Amino acid sequence: MPIQLECLSHTPLHGYVDPAPEVVAEVERVQAAARDRVRAFDPELVVVFAPDHFNGFFYDVMPPFCIGAAATAIGDFKSLAGKLPVPADLALSLAESVMAADIDVALSHRMQVDHGCADALAALTGSLHRYPVIPVFINSVAPPMATLRRARLLGDAVGRFLSRAGKRVLVVGSGGISHEPPVPELAGASEEVAERLIAGRNPSPESAARQARTVAAAKSFVAGDSHLHPLNPEWDRAFLSLLASGELTAVDGMTNDAITRDGGKSAHEIRTWVAAFGALAAYGPYRASLDFYRAIPEWIAGFATMHAEPAAV
C-alpha cells in the first residue's frame, strides 16, 4: 500500500516572537501546500515520530523510544490540546512487530504529547483527530540518547510493519534542525529543577513561567545577546541533502557529541526525521524534495520542510 512522508520543523514561538511577516507568510504557504498533499493522499493512518520537551516524558522513566497506544496532547504554548484518535490494537501490533525486529521500544497507554507532536498534526491536517494517528516518541533532549543508527533502525522496523498493514500511511518527522532553545538539563541542575525533570508531570503552575523564559530567550537570541548555540545553516543543509540522497545509512556515522557541537543541544530532534525516512526507505528507493529551509532566529531554529514518496510512484 502507498506511503507518503512529510518532515517539518516545529516551533512553540510562532505568535510569540515572529520573524518578518513575509517570512511567516512563506512558512504558512509551504505548510498549506503540505496540507494539500496530505488531503489529496487521504491517509488511513498517520504515524508521527516526535520528541518531547519534559512535558510528557521525564527522568523517572526515560525510554529512548515509545509507541503510544493511547495519547493526549497537553496544549503547551498555543498548541492544540485533546485526545488523539489512536487505533490501540494497531499500535499494540506495531509495538510487538518492532520488538520482534530487535528494537527495544516502550509502550504507553497514557502518553502525553506536547507541541512537538501536536504542531505537526495541526500544520499537516488542521487538527489532532482528522485521521487515525499513532505517536512514536523519540527521546531527543534527555541524555543518554539512542544513536542516529538506532533511530534509523526503529524507522525501518516501523516501515516494514506498515508495508504489511494494508493502509495508506502518512509518516511524519517533527523536529530539528539546528537549534538550542533553553531546555533544562539534569546535569548540574538545582534540586528543584532536577525534581521537575525527574517527575514533573502536569506542572500547570509552572507552565506560564516556562513559556515566558522561552520567549525571553528568543528575544535575546535575536538581539545577539545569548549564550545559546548559534544556528548552523551549512550543517542543516548538509543533513537535508543526505536525506534527499537516499543514502540513509550515512547517518550512522553521526555521533551525539558531533550533533551537539555542530547543531546545538536540541538538534538531536533530527532523529525524528531519520526515523521517518527509515520507515519510508523500508518500502524501497524514494525521491525527496526540500520544500523550504531558512534559519529563523526569532524561532531559535533552522526551519525546514521536506516531503518524499517511493520512487516507483
Curated annotation (Swiss-Prot):
Q: What is its EC number?
A: 1.13.11.16
Q: Quick one: which gene encodes this?
A: mhpB
> Which Pfam families does this chain map to?
LigB
GO MF annotations, alphabetized? 3-carboxyethylcatechol 2,3-dioxygenase activity; ferrous iron binding
Q: Which UniProt keywords apply?
A: Aromatic hydrocarbons catabolism, Dioxygenase, Iron, Oxidoreductase
Catalytic activity from the UniProt record: 3-(2,3-dihydroxyphenyl)propanoate + O2 = (2Z,4E)-2-hydroxy-6-oxonona-2,4-dienedioate + H(+); (2E)-3-(2,3-dihydroxyphenyl)prop-2-enoate + O2 = (2Z,4E,7E)-2-hydroxy-6-oxonona-2,4,7-trienedioate + H(+)
Broadest EC class assigned to this enzyme: oxidoreductase
Oligomeric state and interaction partners are given as:
Homotetramer.
Q: What InterPro entries does the annotation carry?
A: DHPP/DHXA_dioxygenase, Xdiol_dOase_suB
Question: What function does this protein fulfil?
Answer: Catalyzes the non-heme iron(II)-dependent oxidative cleavage of 2,3-dihydroxyphenylpropionic acid and 2,3-dihydroxicinnamic acid into 2-hydroxy-6-ketononadienedioate and 2-hydroxy-6-ketononatrienedioate, respectively. Also catalyzes the cleavage of catechol.
Instruction: Give coiled-coil spans as residue ranges.
Output: none
Q: What is this protein called?
A: 2,3-dihydroxyphenylpropionate/2,3-dihydroxicinnamic acid 1,2-dioxygenase
- Please list the residues that make up the active site: 115 (proton donor), 179 (proton acceptor)
Recorded metabolic or biological pathway in which this protein acts: Aromatic compound metabolism; 3-phenylpropanoate degradation
Q: Which cofactor does it need?
A: Fe(2+)
| Protein species of origin | Cupriavidus necator (Alcaligenes eutrophus)
The record's family statement is:
Belongs to the LigB/MhpB extradiol dioxygenase family.
* One GO BP: 3-phenylpropionate catabolic process
